[in-house]
């Protein structure tokens, strides 16, 4: 669980900072949220599988 939270935090920071550094005109949280959504769409199957594994471990 800590790994998921850490990964999400890193992706959020990267998605917000990179557009600002690269000087995009619409840089900032709005532009970053679009990038983050794209990343999450690609990650979703892996994330769902991980959450499923965690759930089965908890349930026994």
From Swiss-Prot:
<dbReference type="GO" id="GO:0005576">
    <property type="term" value="C:extracellular region"/>
</dbReference>
<feature type="modified residue" description="Glutamine amide">
    <location>
        <position position="59"/>
    </location>
</feature>
<keyword id="KW-0800">Toxin</keyword>
<keyword id="KW-0027">Amidation</keyword>
<keyword id="KW-0528">Neurotoxin</keyword>
<feature type="signal peptide">
    <location>
        <begin position="1"/>
        <end position="23"/>
    </location>
</feature>
<comment type="function">
    <text>Toxin that causes a rapid and irreversible paralysis when intrathoracically injected into insects (blowflies). Does not cause spontaneous nocifensive behaviors by intraplantar injection in mice.</text>
</comment>
<comment type="similarity">
    <text>Belongs to the formicidae venom clade 2 family.</text>
</comment>
<keyword id="KW-0964">Secreted</keyword>
<protein>
    <recommendedName>
        <fullName>Myrmicitoxin(1)-Pr4a</fullName>
    </recommendedName>
</protein>
<feature type="propeptide">
    <location>
        <begin position="24"/>
        <end position="33"/>
    </location>
</feature>
<dbReference type="GO" id="GO:0090729">
    <property type="term" value="F:toxin activity"/>
</dbReference>
<keyword id="KW-0732">Signal</keyword>
């Amino acid at each position: 669980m800590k790994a998921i939270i850490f990964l999400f935090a890193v992706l959020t920071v990267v998605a917000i900072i990179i557009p600002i550094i690269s000087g995009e005109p619409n840089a900032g949280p709005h532009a970053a949220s679009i990038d983050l959504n794209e990343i999450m769409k690609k990650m979703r199957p892996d994330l769902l599988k991980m959450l499923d594994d965690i759930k089965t471990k908890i349930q026994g």
